[in-house]
Structures are given as C-alpha cells and as structure tokens.
Amino acid sequence: MTQAKYTPEQIIAKLQAHPKFGSQIKPITKHQSAIISSGLEPAVVIAGAGSGKTETMSNRVLYLVANGFATPDQILGLTFTRKAAGELSIRIRKRLRQLSQLPEFKHITSTSTAVTTYHSYAGKLLSEHAIRYGIDADAEPLGEAAIWQIASDVVRNWSDDSYRNDSAVSTVIKDLLGLSKLMLEHQVKASDIEAIGNEMLEKLQLLAGSTNEDTRAVARAMRQRNSLLPMVEAFMERRKAAGELSFDDQMSLAADIAQNFEDVGTLERGKYKVVLLDEYQDTSQSQVRMLSDRKSKRLNSSQTCALPI
C-alpha cells in the first residue's frame, strides 16, 4: 500500500470541523487509529461488545476511500446477523456522505459498499456458480419448519431393514437434523464417521469394563449413529437434487465452489480489494473454506481482513 495522504486523525478532524455534523463525529484512540490505518495484509482485531467496532470499521472505510486505496464498491463487509449488516451499512453510507461534503473529497460520489451477512454472501456466490454443480440455487433458503418437514418425510418412509433405532420418530428426526448440520458445518463424510465409529466400537470391546452400563450405553449410541448415516445421506442428497437448500447447505456448497474452482476466487478478488469481517467464526469450517485462499489455505493476503470478535 502506498503512502497515505491523510491519517485517520486528520480525516476525523476535518469531519469534526464541519458546522452541520461535526458534533456527531467521535474522536478515535491510538489503538483505533492503528486498526484504521493498517495495511492490506490480513489482520485480526480482538474487541468486545460496546468497544466501538462498528464505528472503527466505518472509519476504516473512510480512510481507504479518502486516500484512494479503494472505492466504496470495492469494499466487502460481512457480518453474522442481518441486524449487524444493516447497522454497518447505514453507518458507512452516512460517513461517506459526510466525507463527500468536505471540499477535499467532493469527487466521492458513490456511497455504495457491499455489506451483507456471511450466509447471504454464500447464497450469492452459490447462485452465480451453481450451474457448475448442476443444481438450482435460485430459490430462497428453506426455513427450519420446511427442513423439519423434509426430514420427517425421509424418516417416516425409510425402509432400510438394516436400520436399528428404538427411539421415537420425533427423536430420530431431531438426531437426523443435528447430525446433518454437523456434517455440513465440519465437512465430514458419512464414510469417515462410520469408520471412526467402528474403530471406537472395537476399542470399547477391549476395555476391561466393557460390560458395564455406561460402556454399553456409549456403544449403543455409536451403533445408532452409524445406522442413521445412510438416512442422513439420503436426506442431504434429496434436498441438493431438488434445490431445497438450507442456509447451512448454501454455506457448505459455496465453500466447495470457492475451493474447487480457482477462477471463482479470481473473480471475487477482482470485485473486492478489501474485505471486512465482523464476528468472524473460525469454528465454522465451511466459513473458513469459503473465505480462504485455495492455494495457501488462509485468508487472501491481497485483501484486508479486519476481524472484530
């Protein structure tokens, strides 16, 4: 990144001097200034609730735009909730409009930045490239009630004689939904779960206390989980083939697309010079994969990634 013409403090001072809205502009701390003026390499910011994350991210955008490092439409902001996305988008637009009223920044005519949720971005990525997998991803993601109904239909019509489970139908549906969600989230195949389950069952049988009630309960649960796996696979394949996708499905498929097709990453990097991530969850394997560089397996070093947590 080239030398900045304006420091964060100078930009804030110019805004504070404006007679109409100057009183709305809060001063920044040294720590916030360092975050706002950081380079274009990935960076992690640890900040608690109420510490001024939204304002700092907004000022980061002002700094980049004021110094010509990026235009508003080259900045992508991702948040965890729609509420947070709305708040950040409104704050950025407001600050950019205020900046454009200063004589030095009259040339700034656009205040449009791409601020959305992680799931919405995944849905957009999937809709643009779903044809690569031959699926229909134009429909809105299914809600919990619709997903539950499909799971109920799969469970009630399951006819595999090898399936063994004495639980109530409602419990099986709940287990089916929970296991499929975890498999999508952590990108685990049914065959891998079954292999590990069988290995653990063998080890349980070798334990000296393998006949006690606790050990038998664990073994029983693992056998039931393994017997549930074919049903989970059928549930997931049915929805994928019909385009009946949940938010978790969209995130998982978007991650697959980002990882398996190098040109997708190239296209996205061409759109956005800067990426700001709010409440980034590195415990979500799909989210990590979607936002990672396919070659280096890390967040793209050509972009700025501010990660307030």
Placement of each model-derived feature along the sequence:
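Walker B catalytic acidic pair
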Residues: 279
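Conserved small/polar residues in nucleotide/adenosyl-binding loops
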Residues: 295-301, 307
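P-loop NTPase Walker
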Residues: 1-135, 263-266, 275, 285
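A ubiquitous short alpha-helical element
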Residues: 44-46, 76-79, 137-138, 216-223, ...
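ATP-hydrolysis module of ASCE/P-loop NTPase motor domains
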Residues: 107-112, 130-224, 272
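Conserved helicase/translocase P-loop NTPase motor core
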Residues: 118-122, 224-274, 284-290
